[in-house]
Amino acid sequence: GAHYIDLADGRRFVCDFPAAMQAAFAAAGRTAVAGASTVPALSSAVIDHLCAGWQRIDSIDICIAPAQRAPRGQATLAAVLSYCGLPIDVWDGGRWQPHSGWARPSPVQFQRLSPRLGAVCDIPDLEIFPAHYRARDRVTFRAALEVGLAQRAFATLATLRRWGVLPHPEKLAWLMHHAGGALDFLGTPLGGMVVRVAGADAQGQPRRRAWHIAADNDHGPEIPCMAAILLARQLAAGQPLPTGAHTSTSLLPLEAFAPEFAKWGMVTDVVEE
């Protein structure tokens, strides 16, 4: 049998993968990793780094901010439109609450990018991290498009779906994919990501920290591939990974990503807030 690594970011696929595949891969003595991508592989590596030694984590807020001019695919657009306006279970206020996908965008601040509006998206982290990190208050994930008009268009589609006017916004993926290029002149090749955490450090003192990455020259789409590349290199070098089926959560340290960031000229910052 062979080892298995994927870059999936579908919440149900990634979260259900370990239980569904554990027996088969454990019996074969092989490793299977789902979601070896920006989320939850890189996002968990960042949280592990920011919160090392902390007594507790209260909140985790993640936002990905793609560059308007970066390459984008119609299939990806269809996938995100599929839950636009649908309720997403989010750990918020210490309990599970429904948040509407892509609705009600709110401001997000970045270290090296201009402020953007970000809206809730459905990813594995929302389900994995509350238990994995025992987050007391909330775990959120937002996507922040560079052009505000595009972000508000998604919010409008979410509203239309909630009203029952547009039950299948994913059918507009082809149109929006081609129309999106008309907005490229309003954007830049600069994208990024921020992970914010709050909690109590090793001394029990309140702490708020943030990790930022900025990817210029339309290199942002290289980030989702990095975790899979790093894990594949480990296997090729004979370095053991846990047998059985797993998500990529906390399988890689943040330091492992540093050479990949440098290769593409990406800049990271850790900020005490």
Residue spans for each PLM region:
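Short, ordered loop/turn segments at secondary-structure junctions
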Residues: 2, 9-12, 37
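Hydrophobic beta-strand scaffold residues
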Residues: 3-4, 32, 268
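Rossmann-fold NAD(P)-binding glycine/threonine-rich loop
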Residues: 8-31
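Adenosine-phosphate binding glycine-rich loop
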Residues: 28-67
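Catalytic-loop motifs flanking and including active-site residues across diverse enzymes
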Residues: 42-46, 122-125, 223-228
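Buried hydrophobic packing segments
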Residues: 46-51, 129, 227-235
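Active-site-lining helix/loop region of Rossmann-like oxidoreductase modules
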Residues: 52-199, 205
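C-terminal active-site/capping subdomain that shapes the small-molecule cofactor and substrate pocket
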Residues: 159-273
